[in-house]
Amino acid sequence: MTGQSQFAGVWCPSITPMDNDGKIDLNGLNQHLKRLTEAKIDVILLMGSIGEFASFTLEERLLLIREARAMSSLKMVANVSSTCQNDVLLMAQEAYRSGYDAVMILPPYYYGQTAKQLLSYFRQLGQKLSGKWFAYNFPARTGCDLTPELVASLAAEFPNFAGIKDTVDCQSHTRSMIQTTRAVREDFAVLSGYDEYYIPNLLAGGAGIISGLNNVMPELFVSAREAF
């Protein structure tokens, strides 16, 4: 899977710099993304959990999407998660228009969802999204789990469903996600969301890591990638 996914490797979920007045610091973001680019990571994730996406207004998130894409030549993915599906689609449309390689989407958070509801939700999105997309599995924050079987079903149905960030503190869960999705899609990227699971992810045939630590020391994970 690792060799066949265009999104394999070391990802950084970028921080979102703010000024002393609590406004987005675009110059600071530009400098930060420049450093990540020079460190030769593979993919930048904009507005992930560590990027504090839930703290911003829709207008601020659209501004970030529009402005950040030109700050790096690396592959970039925008997290467009929201409890409002129309906002998800609006941000996704802006991301595709701005040149992002994909978008990432959490299940509706706050409302705990059943497997049937999750399948329906992502099917609706899959039918409306015009580009590649990732699911973001973070049960500790959403109150629901995207199971390997559910994800494999969606991967088989939607070619533009490019992969998943599996932020579950259980390596066997991610291993099962890798094995189950691989049975239906060799190009499907399963990425771990915990720093310490990078090498176990690769050993299991996964696509890599989305590590917040890369904001501070991206060279560490790049060197691990090169050594593997």
Language-model features and meaning:
Residues Q127-K128, A140-F228:
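Catalytic alpha/beta core domains of metabolic enzymes, predominantly
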Residues T2-D145:
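Active-site beta->alpha loop and helix N-cap motifs at the rims of alpha/beta catalytic domains
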Residues M1, R35, E94-A95, A155, ...:
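A general structural signal for stabilizing positions within well-ordered secondary structure
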